[in-house]
Amino acid sequence: MAHSNAYDVIIIGAGPAGLSLARSLAGTTLKVAIIDPASEQTLKNPPPDGREIALTHYSKELLQEMGAWDAVPEGEIFFLRSAKVVDGTSPFELHFETPDKARGKPADTLGYLISNHHIRQSVYSQVEHQANLTWFTEQKVQTVGATPEQAHVVLTSGEKLTAALVVAADSRFSTTRQQMGIPVD
């Protein structure tokens, strides 16, 4: 029979955003749950998915503070020297060049380009055995909802979780967000 588990924060999705949030809560007294349909082995060694993430200098600092930056293979960090932003058929575009300074320090790059799976792997390595963090791997969210008192999540296994806060970090096509009626423009 399913039983209730109370948490302070439930994070739905173990991608870069969900894992980074979990890592940022390390060292607190908060009881955190993280739910993801992938297996523990897949989270530990995610396969390449063809996505590359452009990181700012601030994102690099955050990953450094988490201890995750050094876990990214050095040969897999690529430097961005410039960028161009276009919007469909619009004749307008934005150009960004390497600034002289970034975050108050001399800069030799606009930012960094790293494969999504390397970011996931590096941040996962920092949260894998984190205290006060419970993993629900190979699980999907069946339903999610909220009352003024708390949020509740039911997993496909039938297990029921409650928390003061549920974070929908389950992709830009978040089914959690859709179930909660949160629009995206």
Language-model features, listed with the residues they occupy:
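Short, flexible hinge/linker loops that cap or flank conserved catalytic cores
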Residues: 2-4, 160
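N-terminal Rossmann-like FAD-binding beta1-loop-alpha1 element of flavoenzymes
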Residues: 6-34
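Conserved Rossmann-like nucleotide-cofactor binding loop
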Residues: 17, 40, 173
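Glycine-rich FAD pyrophosphate-binding loop
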Residues: 26-51
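Short glycine-rich hinge loops at helix-strand junctions in the catalytic core
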Residues: 29, 67, 132
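N-terminal FAD cofactor-binding segment of flavoenzymes
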Residues: 47-88
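Conserved N-terminal helical subregion
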Residues: 78-179
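A short alpha->loop->secondary-structure connector
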Residues: 183-185
